Each structure stands twice: as C-alpha cells, then as structure tokens.
C-alpha cells in the first residue's frame, strides 16, 4: 500500500496528521518559504508526543540550495541535533553552483546523519540533470527523493516521476507538490509508492484586536491573521483513497 507523508508546520499539525491516518510526517517551519528547519522547541515537543515517524527538514533559509560555509555549518549542526533527539530520518539537499548534487557536502551530511533515513528534497527539481543526479543520490545512500518531476506540480511532472521510478537501483521516489485527494488516483495508478501532501488550509487567527495598519512581513499584502494548518479531513480522505485502491 502506498505510504502517505504529510508536511506539517507545528506539533498540533503533526498530531492532526497522525490522528487522521498519515504514515509519516515531514516537519518544517515557514510554509511561505517552502519549509525551513523547525526550532529546537518544536523538535522536542513533536519527538515527545508524535508516535508515527517524523522526518524534520534541514534547510537554513529559503531560496536556492547552494549554501555558504556558515549556512552549511548550521546544516551539519542541525543534522546532529536531529540525530541526537532520536528522529528516524531527516530531509535535506545541497546543490553546487552548476545545479549538480554537491557531493562533498552531501557526504558530510550522510556521515553526520549516520543510521537516519535521509530524504533528498525538492532541490532535486532544481538540478540540471535528473538521471545523473539520481545516480549520485543512490551512490550516497539516500533513502528517497521528494520530487514533482521537475515541474511546478507533481501531476504535470508525472511522466518524469514514472521515468525516475523505473530507473535501475534508484532510491524511493516520493511524489510531492500539489498532490491532493482529487488527483491522488493518478499517482496510485502509476505505481507511485510514496506520496507527499500538505493537506493544508489557512485558518483565521483567534485574535480579536488587529492592527491593520502594521505588518511584520516584508510582503505588505501578507495576511498575518491567518495560519497554515493540516486539514484532518483531507488527510483522512487521502488515506481512504489509498486503502480503497489497495483493496481493488
């Protein structure tokens, strides 16, 4: 049966995902940045309360995946922290200036991660040569690759995802970006074994007083009185689709 991973941005969201049938959580901060390293407090609270596997993302900033020496030092420290806290896996990725996997840096990450299952995230979708990159990731011992097939969403990239799945000795290929209940059957019918979804919604802030003339964001149009949450009903619906597909 296909595995359902849900991207979560808080302990509460991780618990919601777990309660509604998620098989694994990718734990992140900063949804508008596409996911950054969670705080130590969030990591500890999730580790204590969530019982399904949780893989934190290790990404120090938004934007590209070519990092300064200081940023890379922070990545290694965060990898060590996640390992020490007892998480079973993590999610990360580093590219060089030419859009290839930065092999020397990824080798250091793999050494720091030790026995943890490492997912190479959607930095893969920004690489110059996906099949060459897939070979490099297999050589590193990467457990899985999260990808949209190098398109803006995974449904558009499904043909590339299928090509990657068919590649000999490839890591597990996990489809992600725009995967939701209404299109999930396309991925299941194609033989995708792991799917990644935010199953998310924006929830209004409980604050009654709102200073509408002030923004804490560099984006003056950002709605600071809404929060990104996991929609438990959406998770349960996706899990049900997977179970029914398996029973066919």
From Swiss-Prot:
Q: Which UniProt keywords apply?
A: Cytoplasm
Q: Can you say where in the cell this protein is located?
A: Cytoplasm
A molecular function (GO) held by this record is: copper ion binding
Q: Which family does it belong to?
A: Belongs to the CutC family.
Q: Where is the signal peptide?
A: none
A Pfam family this protein belongs to? Answer: CutC
What's the protein name? Answer: PF03932 family protein CutC
GO CC terms: cytoplasm
Q: Which PANTHER family match?
A: COPPER HOMEOSTASIS PROTEIN CUTC (PTHR12598), COPPER HOMEOSTASIS PROTEIN CUTC HOMOLOG (PTHR12598:SF0)
Q: How does it assemble?
A: Homodimer.
Q: Which InterPro entries match?
A: CutC-like, CutC-like_dom_sf
């Amino acid at each position: 049966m296909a595995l359902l991973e849900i991207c979560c941005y808080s302990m509460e969201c991780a618990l919601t995902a777990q309660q509604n049938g998620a098989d694994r959580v990718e734990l992140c901060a900063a949804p508008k940045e596409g996911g950054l390293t969670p705080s130590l407090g969030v990591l500890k609270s999730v580790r204590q309360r969530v019982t399904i596997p949780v893989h934190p993302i290790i990404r120090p900033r938004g934007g590209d995946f070519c990092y300064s020496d200081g940023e890379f030092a922070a990545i290694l420290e965060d990898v060590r922290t996640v390992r020490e806290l007892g998480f079973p896996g993590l999610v990360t990725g580093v590219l060089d200036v030419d859009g290839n996997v930065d092999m020397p840096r990824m080798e250091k990450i793999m050494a720091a991660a030790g026995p943890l299952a490492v997912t190479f995230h959607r930095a893969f979708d920004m690489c110059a040569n996906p099949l060459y990159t897939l070979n490099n990731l297999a050589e590193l011992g990467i457990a899985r690759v999260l990808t949209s097939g190098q398109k803006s969403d995974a449904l558009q990239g499904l043909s590339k995802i299928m090509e990657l799945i068919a590649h000999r000795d490839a890591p597990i290929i996990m489809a992600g970006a725009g995967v939701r209940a209404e299109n999930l059957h396309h991925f299941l019918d194609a033989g995708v074994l792991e799917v990644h979804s935010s199953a998310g919604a924006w929830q209004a802030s409980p604050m009654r007083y709102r200073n509408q003339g002030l923004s804490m964001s560099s984006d003056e149009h950002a709605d600071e009185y809404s929060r990104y949450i996991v929609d438990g009903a959406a998770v349960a619906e996706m899990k049900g689709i997977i179970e029914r597909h398996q029973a066919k």
